[in-house]
Amino acid sequence: MILEGSYPYVHGGVSSWTHQYIQAMPDTRFVLWCIGAEAKSRGVYKYELLPNVDEVKEVFLDDAMRLKGRGRHLKFSDAEKGELKKLFEGEKPEWDVLFELFQEKKVNPVDMLMSPVFLDIIMQLCEERFAYLSFTDFFYNVRSMILPELYLITQEVPRADIYHATATGYSGILGSLAKWKYKKPFVLTEHGIYTREREEELLRAQWVLPYFKNQWINLFHLFSDCAYSHADAVTALFHRANEAQMELGCEKKKLRVTPNGVHIERFAGVRDKKEDGWTDIGAIVRIAKIKDIKTMIYAFAEVKREIGNVRLHIMGDVDDEEYYEACLTLIRQLGVEDIIFTGSVDVAEYIKKLDFIILTSISEGQPLSVLEAFAAGRACVTTDVGCCRELIEGDDGLGAAGICVPPMNKEQIAQAMIELCREPLERKRMGAVGRKRVEKYYTHDISMENYRRLYEEIRV
């Protein structure tokens, strides 16, 4: 399994899926090839590793910035120069040429980035496309973009029968490298559309100068092209995601829809919350910008003005400490009460205290939190991202299992919350619909059987 920024370092949807996935295949031995942002996370896990995990191979992107050159004078063939030039210019390279250069010929990335070939290419590129910038700024931007990627493709590749990556980004590069090196099947699973998510983040980012944003966005498009072209099968959680993958260049014949599943037996004993005069709303979510907790807080403040006896329980780890502090500051500024940050909890147990669930993310794939809410018979208010509308409304004739509203729209989110607060019979009916939908389409057993069949198919 090739993992990026998720298991076993942080809690979250992809991490929960990974843990349950490994757990569901006790007869399969796993090597976890984990990509993290910072080396300080080495060996610091939020999950206890399962018995069928034989090895955790860790690689951290910030180690690339500490890499030392060997001082070698490098010579490149015309083909190698051509593919390096494409990469630096943001055009699709022949990835296998680059893999051979850094894997077999053991070219040191720092030596390459100080070579006359590299300097000639980016000097020309700067003159042609970025003449208004200083060469120093341009050089260090390109270096910071390219060095982590090149560092990754120098890594020793663990041997496996199948390589399975959970994103098209850096993990997709490693999956492609493994496919090239050992000629074994490569499966790519996208829980969200990684390229689109990075694009949204970069457009809002303050750390990237405006005139470099397109370069960074294009880099992640190159990553997705690499992963899609090397993968034997590409899975998504819902049909709209498959359409996005095709738009990004994936061949239709490689695509599969493999929805997530939930262990419904964990929630079998969950009944309606006992009446206590309060309406309790839950958010099963890590504290991160992409989950848009601030809009949730603004919306809840509106709800609180309309309905006094209502509480908001935000259940999940702090993923972004700075954003968490900003959320606390916002709560103080608004003067809103009864918002409870619980930290990580046993969802199946805690959800017994809740009347319904809310999700205000600006980007999602197929949120596990919604499936868990449905399994517990809880209606949901969600933003219209990923497959949330598909989960809420369905096309199965069962009816609506909640309310789907536009992202970042605090007024409509608040109105949906108020509606479910004031209509207990309706939210219970919606919760029952959600439970039926999960039982029919989204169980863990169904999901795992889909992956087993896929593995058998690509190994033939």
Predicted regions and their residues:
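Short hydrophobic beta-strand element within catalytic cores of glycosyltransferases
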Residues: 379-382, 386-393
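Nucleotide-activated donor-binding/catalytic signature segment of Leloir-type glycosyltransferases, i.e.
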Residues: 313, 324-344
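Aromatic "clamp/platform" in nucleotide-sugar-dependent glycosyltransferases that forms part
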Residues: 362
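Short acidic alpha-helix that forms the nucleotide-activated donor recognition element
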Residues: 225-229, 343-354, 375, 393
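Conserved donor-binding/catalytic core segment of Leloir-type glycosyltransferases
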Residues: 271-302, 313
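Carbohydrate-associated surface elements
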Residues: 240, 261
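A charged, aromatic-enriched C-terminal amphipathic alpha-helix characteristic of glycosyltransferases
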Residues: 425-456
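Conserved acidic donor-binding segment of nucleotide-sugar-dependent glycosyltransferases
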Residues: 398-410, 419-424
